[in-house]
Amino acid sequence: VAIAAVLSGILSPVPEIIVIAHNIRSTHNVGAIFRTAEGFGISKIILSGYTPYPKLSGDTRLPHISEKLTSQIHKTALGAEEMVPFAYSEQIPLNSLKESGYRIVALEQNDRSINLADYTSPEKVALL
């Protein structure tokens, strides 16, 4: 208990982060998203639109399509697709994320962007 008290005094709370990957064409980019998400401790990935996704239980895609996409994603993800929880949705579930307390943050580089080092994350954030 004493160690936990000491650690809680020096460690900041880690935000719960969801990554939303919408309309990503390349299976290699999807694999890279999984691999990066695992390295950063991302809580979940939501794949949406025409983004390819690994095999899901109850997958309605033709088996050869599902297996081919899963294999291609695995080549880049290096197994991270089995470690990071994910879901697929045709539409981005923005309303349900907001209702669950997530702040939606769009990632884009422009003259109004905030440097990541200067950004203070809320407790629950969904990166789009």
Named regions from a protein language model:
Residues 4-110:
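RNA substrate-binding interface of SAM-dependent RNA methyltransferases
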Residues 119-122:
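Charged helix-capping and loop-helix junction motifs
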Residues 125:
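Beta-strand/loop substructures that line and gate deep hydrophobic ligand-binding cavities in soluble
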